[in-house]
Amino acid sequence: MLGHYNKKQNKMDENNIKIIGTHHFQDKKDIEEHIDSFNPDIILIELCNGRISMMNNPEQKQKQKFSILGLISKSVNKKAKKEGKEFGSDLKSAYRMAKEKNIKIGLIDRPLVETNVFFKAVPLSEKVAMLNELRKFSNKSIKIEDIINEVENTETEDILKQLKQKCPEIFYYLITSRDEYMINKIKGYLYDNQGKRILIFIGKGHEKKIKDNLGFNQTK
């Protein structure tokens, strides 16, 4: 059956399953092209109910308690808006277009509340290092376009390796543990929707691990 995930063989029929790794400033038109060309029955997105709620009710962001994750998001958003861009435009566009086209949606990211709780376990030294990097980012004349170019022209593995070396615990909670969470969510959707065309939008940093785990690009 097309689109069937074979747990035993850990292989994936790629005819009906497609994973798109995006950077979080991706143009709306790029997302739309992926959706229109693949014509999915279901779209799985690296979002959670908490993020959807904040998308629909921006004032909720103001009521959030202080967190380093929130500070990072606020800092990037501020710089992005100055350049006429929107942080998270890729996933937001995928969600909104799926709604407009009446395509079934699956949210696969770990709830934001849980991520923030786990993040408290990060050592103070790494949090300070992250805040220092954030301060440099805010003060520098780095443009969002420069960041996009670096992401598009640098091996994702190299970028992840740098983060892991500098902040191993942050890397675990932001990347590794979320990879595992999303893999399990995706497998559940694939098992429950065999034969359906499923399009999956995730950040580039998660793409390789998830594809490898699901058996993409493996010889049968």
Regions inferred by a protein language model and the residue ranges of each:
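Compositional signal for N-terminal targeting/processing segments
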Residues: 1-220
